[in-house]
Amino acid sequence: MIKINLQLFAHKKGVGSSRNGRDSAAKRLGVKRADGQFVLAGNILVRQRGTKIHPGVNVGIGKDDTLFALKDGKVKFARLGRDKKQVMIVTAE
């Protein structure tokens, strides 16, 4: 007579370990100054990844694609064609 010794092992790891449970902090991206709002030179207008909104007159662009005011004035958002947006600063001069 043949005896078979069959052992079954766990397919999944047991309790006490979690493979989830991590998340990155939000990056606070988006428009920081509204259309028509007065800004000072150096104020951040838009934080973005890539150029969803392009810089216009009196607007600079940082190495992380952040748009900021180069001069004091009012913020003006405009559309360029169907799919392009631009932000500019209109000065009082």
Curated annotation (Swiss-Prot):
<dbReference type="GO" id="GO:0022625">
    <property type="term" value="C:cytosolic large ribosomal subunit"/>
</dbReference>
<keyword id="KW-0689">Ribosomal protein</keyword>
<feature type="propeptide">
    <location>
        <begin position="1"/>
        <end position="9"/>
    </location>
</feature>
<keyword id="KW-0687">Ribonucleoprotein</keyword>
<dbReference type="InterPro" id="IPR018261">
    <property type="entry name" value="Ribosomal_bL27_CS"/>
</dbReference>
<dbReference type="GO" id="GO:0006412">
    <property type="term" value="P:translation"/>
</dbReference>
<protein>
    <recommendedName>
        <fullName>Large ribosomal subunit protein bL27</fullName>
    </recommendedName>
</protein>
<dbReference type="Pfam" id="PF01016">
    <property type="entry name" value="Ribosomal_L27"/>
</dbReference>
<dbReference type="InterPro" id="IPR001684">
    <property type="entry name" value="Ribosomal_bL27"/>
</dbReference>
<dbReference type="GO" id="GO:0003735">
    <property type="term" value="F:structural constituent of ribosome"/>
</dbReference>
<comment type="similarity">
    <text>Belongs to the bacterial ribosomal protein bL27 family.</text>
</comment>
